[in-house]
Regions:
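Active-site cores that bind ATP or allylic diphosphates and position pyrophosphate for catalysis
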Residues: 107-152
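N-terminal Rossmann-like or analogous alpha/beta NTP/dinucleotide-binding catalytic cores
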Residues: 2-123
Length: 152
């Protein structure tokens, strides 16, 4: 019986991998295999200042040497989509523009702890956690965010 399981490994090429990476990726590979699914290698290379091509190549070589196997990734010749985040920037920008047009982009001044606590207070367990409406700014504040880099 085939499953639709899709696991992923997502190293950031800002340095060489260590045994902790290998262990984590091995478990991800075994999980995908046990679920009769696939493992996807997706590179998190959006830190333009620290990511290096040499680290990217070394990660693929080292994980392959270690015995990790993935079915989709930047090193697969049948690649029909990009598995490097930096190559997906046009998709991210389109999604950002779509959310902006819907009025769903706004600054957040709450801490992760505040948001986690609000999510824990949801009464209906069937609902996804939703950012509390009372915390959302007025539309004039949201309209000032003109680019993905506009608010940090």
């Amino acid at each position: 019986m085939a499953h639709n399981y899709r696991g992923r490994i997502a190293p950031t090429p800002t340095g060489y991998l260590h045994l902790g990476h290998a262990r984590t990726f091995w478990f991800a590979m075994e999980r995908a295999r046990s679920e009769e699914g696939i493992l996807i290698y997706r590179e998190e290379d959006l830190d333009y200042n620290r990511c290096r091509k040499a680290y990217s190549q070394a990660a693929i070589e080292d994980l392959s040497w270690f015995g990790c196997v993935w079915q989709k990734g930047p090193d697969k010749s049948e690649m029909k989509q990009s598995y490097r985040q930096s190559e997906r920037m046009p998709l991210f920008l389109k999604a950002w523009k779509d959310l902006k047009e819907q009025g769903l982009i706004y600054p957040c001044e709450k801490s992760r702890k505040d948001i986690r606590k609000a999510s824990e207070n949801i009464q209906n367990i069937d609902l996804e956690p939703i950012y509390p409406e009372a915390w959302r700014p007025s539309h004039d504040v949201a309209d000032k965010i003109d680019s993905p880099e506009g608010y940090n």
